[in-house]
């Protein structure tokens, strides 16, 4: 019986899982919509919902807890200055998961995880080294 086992292991060590969810949380906060596999999206949702709740609290201790979780100061700034006030009146349920078919190659189920009431312009903004190189050239 598997009673009481929460979450999935994803065939990774604990540290690798924590790093993976930190990176995915930062990507979701940055772009407000990401595509990943369905099990990863299902396990990412509670992590991000707790981060949004920290952003709604807005005090110094909550900010330090968020920094310890996602390790990206710019994303923590967005979390507390943009997302926290945006969801101040909403009592939870900040993310939505939509199934997105199956991945070519290994047929893994894909999902789109996004924020409810997301900023549609945030998707793909300043993403990747090519964008950074283009901005540096200007």
UniProtKB/Swiss-Prot annotation:
SUPFAM superfamilies per UniProt: Prokaryotic ribosomal protein L17 (SSF64263)
Cysteine pairs bridged by disulfides in the record: none
Domain of life: Bacteria
Keyword hit for ATP-binding: no
InterPro entries linked: Ribosomal_bL17, Ribosomal_bL17_CS, Ribosomal_bL17_sf
Keyword terms of this UniProt record: Ribonucleoprotein, Ribosomal protein
Keyword Ribosomal protein (UniProt): yes
Signal peptide annotation: none
GO biological process, one term: translation
Self-association state and partner proteins as the record states: Part of the 50S ribosomal subunit. Contacts protein L32.
The protein's name in its UniProt record: Large ribosomal subunit protein bL17
